[in-house]
Amino acid sequence: MKKLSIIYDVTALCPWNCAICCIGATSDKSCRNNELTQEQKLNVAHQVRELQENGYEVRMDLSGGELFTDIPAHTELLTALSEVLGRTKLGVSCSGYGIDSKLANFLGSTVHDVEMTMDVVPHHPYKLRPAAYSVAAAKAVALLKEAGCEVGLQTVASTYNSSYADALAVFAWACANGVDNWSILRFFPSGRGADYPEAAMTDAQCEAYVHMVQEMVDSLPVGHKPEVDFHYLMPGHKKYTNICRCVRHSIGILPNGDVVACFWALDSSTGAVDPKFLLGNVKDNSLLEILNGEKARYWFDCEHCCELGSGSTPERSVA
């Protein structure tokens, strides 16, 4: 079986308008004009089934934009994908927006995990996110835990939130609120984040941050601690590697159906930074056809380090 992680950003609609949004999501509803129709979205589930029938073991994460700006459509899509993949192979990344007890209970029975971003603790000002962004995640955590969901928090580490005080505050909040997993991702200037190159940490800064967090986690005397996972492109821990994962390990699907080899290889207008990263579109070809195509073959055939380099842009992994 060939393992494949797929991140499907279903919509570009989002209430937050974050300064660093990697796909350029917006609260302007006209962004949905280029989005797949519901029928086309549901067809992605059929395409995933075809991958499974042809030797792929697929793990999928649905994200956005904000997935729950359209709860009826996207719960229908999650149901279809859960039936194809099984609950244990399906996850959701969201902000916490729109989650009430009914939606939390649905997610508890349909997906394996729900991950939300918390770069700083609620009510703490942060240059790169709106004021209420962490508050939405915090409110959703309690509802999701009550519904039996596995709950994760993701912190995107940048030069603006990499202090000991910021890291300790988020970790302590996660401990106190029963969060299961704390995932730490390196900030890359992808999408709108390309306008903030100064927010990207160097390899040396990342390594120092990793060691700081590891020591903090080991020494904090609390009863419950979430599992801590560092993204593989953060130097300083045993999982670190800069070997390219494009196509052989993961792909991304954008709201308009474009399939990209490297999810983070997006410019400030959220188009592929180079044509070779654009593999096809699910409206024109199935995922299996795209992965068997010539554009994908380039990535299967090459063995190299991340082309976008250090201070560059890797693909987001859901592994």
Predicted regions and their residues:
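Flexible mid-to-C-terminal extensions adjoining Fe-S/redox cofactors in radical SAM and related proteins
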Residues: M1-L4, G24, D28-K29, D258-V259, ...
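Canonical Radical SAM [4Fe-4S] cluster-binding loop centered on the CxxxCxxC motif
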Residues: M1-Q40, C262-W264
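The −1 position to Zn-ligating cysteines in a subset of zinc-ribbon hairpins
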Residues: L13, N17, I243, D301
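Residue-level recognition of short loop/turn positions
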Residues: N17, S95, L254-N256
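A short acidic, helix-capping loop that chelates divalent metal ions and anchors anionic groups
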Residues: D28-C31, P122-L128, G191-Y196
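Radical SAM/AdoMet-radical enzyme domain recognition
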Residues: Q38-L62, D70-R186
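A C-terminal junction/extension of Radical SAM enzymes
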Residues: F187-A265, A319
